[in-house]
Regions:
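A domain-start/cap signature at the N-terminus of enzymes
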Residues: 1-23, 49, 88, 92-97, ...
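Structural detector of well-ordered beta-strand residues that form the stable sheet scaffold
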Residues: 55, 142-145
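Catalytic His-Asp charge-relay segment
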Residues: 165-167
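Alpha/beta-hydrolase fold nucleophile elbow
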Residues: 112-124
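Acidic (Asp/Glu)-rich catalytic clusters
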Residues: 161-162
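Acidic-histidine catalytic/liganding microenvironments
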Residues: 110, 137-138
Length: 167
């Protein structure tokens, strides 16, 4: 789609390419970076101790993830400098989602990733993206967790009260 993406990979010194290892994907909060998330969360220290690989992507649009249910009622004139991008109708067209999927595939090609142990963690806006990814593509994750950035209830349930889960 013509957009350039940036991400950070962390591979512990103990990595042995003959052995499958877990992958932990850390998603930063709004206006942060993947590298900042790596430092803030200390995932790299845990990766050294536990022997997994980390991936820290940057959100593509001015460090703000394209997430559902947060900015639909947002009026740009209320905060003209806030870099908001509304999500597309079809989740498969969401650049951030496609980037994360492509990065997972890239990591699986580049390293010996255990496909049954891919985890995602997000903080604040990264937690909202983690939930969005898990609800729509969670079949490829072993687990997802986050802190801050709660999800709106209308993103979790449809009009009949059934849980939305396309994974």
């Amino acid at each position: 789609d013509g957009l350039e993406d940036e991400w950070y990979e962390y591979v512990p010194e103990s990595y042995d390419p003959s052995r499958p290892v877990p992958l932990v994907i850390g998603l930063h909060g709004g206006l942060m970076t993947g590298w900042g998330h790596a430092i803030y969360t200390s995932w790299t220290l845990v990766a050294d101790r536990e022997g997994f690989i980390c991936l820290f992507p940057n959100a593509h649009e001015k460090r703000m993830w394209t997430v559902e249910g947060v900015f639909e009622t947002f009026r740009q004139e209320d905060a003209p400098d806030l870099p908001i991008v509304l999500p597309p109708e079809n989740m498969d067209d969401n650049h951030d989602i496609k980037m994360i999927q492509a990065l997972i595939a890239r990591m699986e090609e580049k390293y010996n990733i255990d496909k049954g142990r891919i985890f995602m963690q997000g903080m604040s806006m990264g937690n909202i993206m983690t939930g969005q990814f898990a609800r729509n593509y969670g079949r490829i994750l072993a687990g997802a967790a986050g802190s801050g950035g709660p999800c709106e209830p209308f993103n979790l349930y449809d009009e009949s009260g059934k849980i939305k889960n396309k994974a």
